């Protein structure tokens, strides 16, 4: 009889908690101390297998397996007797009661096999045969028991080499294959494959299946029959037993894929043929039921665990891909979730084995798949797996994508939009691999990407290369824009910090790109897309000479390395812009040459006059010029330059930055603000825009788009439309005249002339109306550019306060920035400016280049005037006032500073309609005054203490 503790453990075996079941099973076996307890437990466990209570069957089966594994004295015959006794349905049982007994017997037989009790010396061939017979009988009870019963037999076959009567055991199982009911079933195929793995010294006869010729089901000539069996066709077709459809695929599929991995059978059908006949044509055929296709998706998931880069292409067959795309395209499809599991598996496999990414991608995007795979299927499968490829795979992907760019199918070659979309998609996909966090950046493929963009963006395509159709200007411009986007990413701090290989992260990639361009230019086979006149060539050569000197200094680890790196980057990017045909960049190059000369050339410094702009003024103008362009790459370049030279900024260069803040946010005042851009005023005067048009401006996104978007041909198309309408009017008039004219009449009478004039006037009115709309649109875009420009300039100021908190020149930014916050109509500028003050003011010390007290006082007065105009400036104005008061605290100007507050306070009280001060400015002033009072009290106390101490000591001495 069991103890109380053991009885409690039996109860815990029924728990739905797996951890509790496992723990209870182990404790129960450990607690058995005598034969009586062992006998009781064995009887209780075999009997409990038929229980339908919670998870009793699972818990009791685990405990029984553990008991049989640990205890060597238990005989298989005894356990089998108990199993049959307690788990045989008696009477006229139906439904769940009947199923409980079937499952109880199945779980018990599993415990016998998994415990290995049949490998003990005490076990006999009769025990082995009895287990096989019971499993075979049980498999015939219900169709849904067949597969799992045979799976237990498969596991039993694996133990045959360890059994003392192995040859007889082999014969007992091999005999099952001689019955058509087994041999022409999925279970029989699985059993055959298991038996072929038994060592030759154990086999007493050949493994053979009835009604198969040749005997091996995976022989090429048997594939059609195998296909019928594997999709479980009617028994009349296969000659075997008919199995009802089950949700899970048969276990045999695992053994089939393992057989193709082992390749021990010389007559094995090629995997390509097997997949095509059995899976693609058998299970994924257009006439297959949804149930079969559901199986097919499971088979695909399983196959991905076994295929290699050599044969993975075979499983991406035509019918499978059609079915996958079809069911992924709509969430309401019956097999949508099954298809989604396949995509998840593909992504998982790609992570585990990067060498598979390229062969997967080439089939998803190929003829059987679709270039639009992600868009058609509403997934991001291609986008997610491409960056996971290894180095060789990514290089292959680039060549694949480049082939899509260079060669378009005949059916779309004449469709300009389709061609441009295809080419843009391919180049964007290349770029997305670089930008993805999933890709491991390696120099060979990063260089390859840049070289592709340079070769086709800056040079004519060699005649030896076949491009169908020929590249348009838009396509070539697209390559240049993608190059700039790639360089923008490679120059970003996020990329550099993510690289453990500092050689890759610290590399000046724009310089690398420029070097490759110059190498290509040297070859007579390559022709630049743009031609430069002698004057431009002279400027370029001069800049290249300076760049060469800069690079030599960097290689020698010379002084001012950070500034030299900044100049190397600046030269490289601007030269790339010049080679792209940007005429404005030529002037920038000359400014950079001048600036470099003033910064690093001692002779130039000596010869410069006071009237000439300083190096920092020139550099600041260059930075502002670059910053005015909507390019994320140039913005990052300016940030790097500004950080490198911020300590060298002088008052004049700071005023240049402040001038941008002071500029009005209107179209007519923006002339000259943007390099190389003509600003048109609206035909109806200056266009007013709501501040809502500028809320939530994401400058990074806009700039990134500017690096990505292709050149629009809108102006050209508008002109073509106008010419077309004019031609139509004139042609109609001419035709009418020809119909009506006689030899004595004029070519066109007055009535016809008036009619023609009216039609022409109508065409021009339409054109003028469209032109006015276009001008209004341009005006809006210009205003948006002004706002974006100011946002970027505010970021420069924030950068300066961050990197130069001790430099008093930062004082120069206070009033211009505060005035801009007050005057702007755009919320984004107001919030951006206030954020700078909120985040940086408390950290400013201004111990160097400290502003004069007189200037500080004037600034304080100005701040209070501005704060009185707008209550929302209260917090910001108070913070600035506090900073300025601290600078005046120990100067004779403190009294006048306090009087500024007094004057503002009186205005706030006496003229509430005119003064809009926020009360916080006065609260903060009182708190500051209290702190100053406490400070002076402490100073006075400290000063008087030594005198008192000295007086007492003198008295003590006199005494």
Curated annotation (Swiss-Prot):
Stretches the record annotates as Disordered: 936-959
Gene Ontology biological-process annotations: regulation of DNA-templated transcription; rRNA processing; rRNA transcription
Gene Ontology CC terms: cytosol; nucleolus; nucleus
Polar residues bias spans: 937-948
Subcellular location: Nucleus
Annotated Basic and acidic residues bias: 950-959
Residues the record lists as Phosphoserine modifications: 742-743
Main location: nucleus
Family under the similarity heading: Belongs to the MYBBP1A family.
Known function: Plays an important role in the regulation of rRNA transcription. Binds to rDNA promoter fragments.
Protein's name according to its UniProt entry: rDNA transcriptional regulator pol5
Top-level taxonomy: Eukaryota, Fungi, Dikarya, Ascomycota, Taphrinomycotina
Gene this protein is translated from: pol5
């Amino acid at each position: 009889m069991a103890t109380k503790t053991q009885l409690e453990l039996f109860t815990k075996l029924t728990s739905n908690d797996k951890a509790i079941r496992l723990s209870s099973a182990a404790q129960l076996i450990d607690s058995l101390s005598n034969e009586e307890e062992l006998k009781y437990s064995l009887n209780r466990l075999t009997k409990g297998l038929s229980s339908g209570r919670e998870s009793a069957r699972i818990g009791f089966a685990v405990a029984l397996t553990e008991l049989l594994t640990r205890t060597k004295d238990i005989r298989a015959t005894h356990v089998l007797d108990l199993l049959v006794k307690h788990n045989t349905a008696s009477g006229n049982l139906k439904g769940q009661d009947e199923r409980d007994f079937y499952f109880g017997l199945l779980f018990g037989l599993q415990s016998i096999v998994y415990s290995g009790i049949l490998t003990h010396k005490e076990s006999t061939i009769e025990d082995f045969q009895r287990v096989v017979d019971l499993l075979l009988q049980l498999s015939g009870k219900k169709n849904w028991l067949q597969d799992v019963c045979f799976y237990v037999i498969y596991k039993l076959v694996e133990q045959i080499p360890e059994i003392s009567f192995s040859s007889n055991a082999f014969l007992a199982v091999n005999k099952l294959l001689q019955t058509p009911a087994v041999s022409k079933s999925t279970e029989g195929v699985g059993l055959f494959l298991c038996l072929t793995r038994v060592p030759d010294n154990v086999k007493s006869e050949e493994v053979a299946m009835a009604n198969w010729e040749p005997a091996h089901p995976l022989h090429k000539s048997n594939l059609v029959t195998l296909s019928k069996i594997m999709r479980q066709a009617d028994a009349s077709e296969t000659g075997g037993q008919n199995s009802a459809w089950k949700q899970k695929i048969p276990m045999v599929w695992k053994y089939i894929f393992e057989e193709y991995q082992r390749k021990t059978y010389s007559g094995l059908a090629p995997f390509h043929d097997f997949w095509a006949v059995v899976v693609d044509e058998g299970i994924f055929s257009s006439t297959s039921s949804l149930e079969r296709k559901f199986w097919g998706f499971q088979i695909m998931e399983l196959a991905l665990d076994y295929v290699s880069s050599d044969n993975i292409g075979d499983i991406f067959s035509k019918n499978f891909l059609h079915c996958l795309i079809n069911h992924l395209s709509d969430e309401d499809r019956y097999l949508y979730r099954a298809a989604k599991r396949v995509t998840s598996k593909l992504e998982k496999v790609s992570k585990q084995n990067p060498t598979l990414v390229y062969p997967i991608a080439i089939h998803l995007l190929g003829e059987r798949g679709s270039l639009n795979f992600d868009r058609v299927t509403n997934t991001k499968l291609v986008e997610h797996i491409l960056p996971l490829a290894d180095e060789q795979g990514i290089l292959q992907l680039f060549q694949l994508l480049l082939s899509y760019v260079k060669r378009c199918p005949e059916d779309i070659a004449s469709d300009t939009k389709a061609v441009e979309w295809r080419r843009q998609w391919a180049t964007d996909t290349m770029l997305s691999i670089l930008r993805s966090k999933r890709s491991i950046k390696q120099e060979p493929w990063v260089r390859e990407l840049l070289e592709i963009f340079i070769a086709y963006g800056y040079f004519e395509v060699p005649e030896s290369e076949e491009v169908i159709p020929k590249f348009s200007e838009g396509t070539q411009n697209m390559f240049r824009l993608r190059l700039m986007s790639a360089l923008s990413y490679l120059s970003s701090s996020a990329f550099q910090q993510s690289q453990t290989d500092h050689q890759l992260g610290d590399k000046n990639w724009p310089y690398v790109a420029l070097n490759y361009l110059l190498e290509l230019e040297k070859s007579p086979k390559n022709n630049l897309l743009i031609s430069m006149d002698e004057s431009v060539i002279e400027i370029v050569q001069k800049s290249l000479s300076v760049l060469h000197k800069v690079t030599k200094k960097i290689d020698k680890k010379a002084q001012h390395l950070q500034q030299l790196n900044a100049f190397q980057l600046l030269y490289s990017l601007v030269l790339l812009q010049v080679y792209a045909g940007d005429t404005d960049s030529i002037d920038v190059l000359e400014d950079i040459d001048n600036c470099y000369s003033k910064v690093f050339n001692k002779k130039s410094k000596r010869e410069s006059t006071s009237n000439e702009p300083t190096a920092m003024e020139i550099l600041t103008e260059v930075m502002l010029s670059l910053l005015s362009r909507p390019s994320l790459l140039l913005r990052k370049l300016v940030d790097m330059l500004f950080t490198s030279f911020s300590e060298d900024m002088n008052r004049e260069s700071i005023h240049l930055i402040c001038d941008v803040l002071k500029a009005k946010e209107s179209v007519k005042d923006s002339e000259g603000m943007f390099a190389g851009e003509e600003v048109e005023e609206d035909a109806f005067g200056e266009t007013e825009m709501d501040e809502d048009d500028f809320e939530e401006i994401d400058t990074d996104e806009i700039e990134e788009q500017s690096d990505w978007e292709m050149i629009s041909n809108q102006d050209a198309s508008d002109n073509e439309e106008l010419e077309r309408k004019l031609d139509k009017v004139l042609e109609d008039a001419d035709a009418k005249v020809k119909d009506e004219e006689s030899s004595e009449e004029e070519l066109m009478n007055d009535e016809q002339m008036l009619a023609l004039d009216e039609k022409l006037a109508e065409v021009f009115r339409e054109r003028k109306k469209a032109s006015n709309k276009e001008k209004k649109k341009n005006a809006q875009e210009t205003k948006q550019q002004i706002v974006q420009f100011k946002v970027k300039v505010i970021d420069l100021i924030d950068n300066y306060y961050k990197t130069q908190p001790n430099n008093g020149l930062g004082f120069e930014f206070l009033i211009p920035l505060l005035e801009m916050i007050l005057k702007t109509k755009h919320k984004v500028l107001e919030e951006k400016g206030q954020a700078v003050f909120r985040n940086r003011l408390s950290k400013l010390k201004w111990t160097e280049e400290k502003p004069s007290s007189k200037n500080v006082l004037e600034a304080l007065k100005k701040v209070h005037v501005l704060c009185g105009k707008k209550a929302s400036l209260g917090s910001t104005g108070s913070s600035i006032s506090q900073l300025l008061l601290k600078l005046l605290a120990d100067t004779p100007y403190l009294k006048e500073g306090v009087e500024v507050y007094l004057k503002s306070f009186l205005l706030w009280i006496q003229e509430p309609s005119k003064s809009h001060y926020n009360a916080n400015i006065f609260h903060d002033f009182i708190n500051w005054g209290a702190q100053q009072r406490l400070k002076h009290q402490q100073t006075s106390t400290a000063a008087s203490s030594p005198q008192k101490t000295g007086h007492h000591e003198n008295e003590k001495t006199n005494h």
